[in-house]
Amino acid sequence: MSSGRIVQIIGAVIDVEFPRDSVPSIYNALEVKSAAGTTLEVQQQLGDGVVRTIAMGSTEGLKRGLEVTDSGAAISVPVGKATLGRIMDVLGNPIDEAGPIATEERWGIHRPAPSFAEQAGGNDLLETGIKVIDLVCPFAKGGKVGLFGGAGVGKTVNMMELIRNIAIEHSGYSVFAGVGERTREGNDFYHEMKDSNVLDKVALVYGQMNEPPGNRLRVALTGLTMAEKFRDEGNDVLLFVDNIYRYTLAGTEVSALLGRMPSAVGYQPTLAEEMGTLQERITSTKNGSITSIQAVYVPADDLTDPSPATTFAHLDATVVLSRDIASLGIYPAVDPLDSTSRQLDPNVIGQEHYDTARGVQYVLQRYKELKDIIAILGMDELSETDKQLVNRARKIQRFLSQPFFVAEVFTGASGKYVSLKDTIAGFKGILNGDYDHLPEQAFYMVGGIEEAIEKAKKL
C-alpha cells in the first residue's frame, strides 16, 4: 500500500506523485485522505512517479499536498443477489438509505470480455408486447438493442415500458444503469418498479447528469459487472442502459483534460475503443445470457454523428424514434421504415411474420412516395389501387400506436400488452383488406384488432 500526494488538480483530472519504485498500475483505485474520501482511478503514468487520474466524485475541498493511498486493485463493486432491490452509485455504495449491502463478494469493474469459445448465440425471440417493435424489429433473447432518438421523442418512456413488460412477463433478473440521465427519471423509475412489485428482481445503478464525468464514465461498467455475475451464475439477465450517449460524452469531457487530441466533432480519439470495450462484454455465454436494451440519444437528430454511428455497429436490432411520427401524435414514435433487426428473417421468425412485416413496410413506403402527389394534386388523381393502398397505410400508421402502462398517468388510457400472435393477425387483416370498411380513427391508440372493431362501433 504505497502512498503519494496530489500535485495538480484540473477539473475532474488529478495528478498524483508517488515514489518511483511504487507507482500504481493503470486502472488502480486510489483513496484520498480527506473528509470526503474521494476515490481516484489511474488513467495514465506520466513518468517521474506521477500518475494522472480521474476523480470518481466531486473534487471540491481537495488541494495540492493531500495524501493519497494506492488500494492495489481496480474499483470493485458488490455483486450477487444482495444487490437486488437496491440503488447504488458508481462505487457500489448504497444511496437508497436502506443500510449497507449484505454481501462480501466484490468484483472489479474492469474485466476481459468472454473469449470466442465461451460465447453462445441464440435466435429465440423476446416478446415485448409493443406491436411495432414485435412486428418490424423483433428482439432476440441475448441480443443487443438500441433505442435511437433525439431529445423528447420518448426514449426513456419506451425504455420504461419495455422494462415493465419484460420484467413482469420475464421472470429473470434485471440490472438498470442510469448513465447521465435526469435524477427525476431515476426516482420515477424506482417508484414504478416498486408499484409493479418487481423491485426485488432489479438492481439499480445511478450516475446521473449532475455527477462528475468520472462517475458517468464508469457507472455503465458498474451495472455491467453486476449483470455479468448473474449471467455467470446461469441466469438470463436483462441489462438496461439509459443513456449510452452520456457514457461517450463523459469520455469526451475528460479526454481533453487527459491531454488527448480531439477527433471528429470534438469526440475523444478513443471513442470506438471505449465503446467496443463496453459492448463486447455485453454478450451471452454458455452459462447464461445478457439481453441488453440501450437508449441512444441522437444529437440534433443526426444519425451520422460519430457517437450514435459507433453504437450502430454493435447492435442486433435498432429501434429508431422519429420526430415526424411523434408530431403526428403517434406513440410509440417508432419509425417502421428506419428500424431494423437481424431477426427479421423468415428462417428465424417464420414466413407469416416476415411477409406481414415486409408487407407493412412496403405499404408505408409507397404511401410516403405518394404523399408528394397527394399534396399537389389531391387524392382524386390517384388510381383506385393507390387510393386503397393509401387508406390501408393510414390505418396501419394508426394501428402502430399503442397506449403504454407507464404513461397511464399522462394519457388517462389504460396500457395494453399485445401478444405477437395478435399483432401479426391484426396487421395481416389490414393488409388483406378485411377492415377496409372501418374508419381509420378506430385504429388509433388501441391494443389488438378486436379493440379497434369495438371502437369503430362507437364512432
Swiss-Prot record:
Task: Tell me which CDD domains the record gives.
Answer: ATP-synt_F1_beta_C, ATP-synt_F1_beta_N, F1-ATPase_beta_CD
Which EC main class describes this enzyme?
Answer: translocase
Arranged from A to Z, the UniProt key words for this protein are: ATP synthesis, ATP-binding, Cell inner membrane, Cell membrane, CF(1), Hydrogen ion transport, Ion transport, Membrane, Nucleotide-binding, Translocase, Transport
One of its Pfam families is: ATP-synt_VA_C
Entry's localization field: Cell inner membrane
The UniProt record gives the binding positions of ATP as G149, G150, A151, G152, V153, G154, K155, T156
Name the catalysed reactions: ATP + H2O + 4 H(+)(in) = ADP + phosphate + 5 H(+)(out)
InterPro entries for this protein: AAA+_ATPase, ATP-synt_VA_C, ATP_synth_F1_bsu, ATPase_a/bsu_AS, ATPase_alpha/beta_chains, ATPase_F1/V1/A1_a/bsu_N, ATPase_F1/V1/A1_a/bsu_N_sf, ATPase_F1/V1/A1_a/bsu_nucl-bd
How does the UniProt record describe the way this protein sits in the membrane? Peripheral membrane protein
One GO molecular-function annotation for this sequence? ATP binding
Q: What are its E.C. numbers?
A: 7.1.2.2
Q: Would I find ATP-binding among this entry's keywords?
A: yes
Query: Would the keyword Cell membrane be found if you checked this record's keyword annotation?
Result: yes
Show the GO cellular component annotation of the record: plasma membrane; proton-transporting ATP synthase complex
Q: Which HAMAP family match?
A: ATP_synth_beta_bact
Q: PANTHER family given for it? A: ATP SYNTHASE (PTHR15184), ATP SYNTHASE SUBUNIT BETA, MITOCHONDRIAL (PTHR15184:SF71)
Its family?
A: Belongs to the ATPase alpha/beta chains family.
Give the record's subunit note: F-type ATPases have 2 components, CF(1) - the catalytic core - and CF(0) - the membrane proton channel. CF(1) has five subunits: alpha(3), beta(3), gamma(1), delta(1), epsilon(1). CF(0) has three main subunits: a(1), b(2) and c(9-12). The alpha and beta chains form an alternating ring which encloses part of the gamma chain. CF(1) is attached to CF(0) by a central stalk formed by the gamma and epsilon chains, while a peripheral stalk is formed by the delta and b chains.
Protein's job = Produces ATP from ADP in the presence of a proton gradient across the membrane. The catalytic sites are hosted primarily by the beta subunits.
Recorded protein name is ATP synthase subunit beta
Q: Which organism is it from?
A: Pseudomonas syringae pv. tomato (strain ATCC BAA-871 / DC3000)
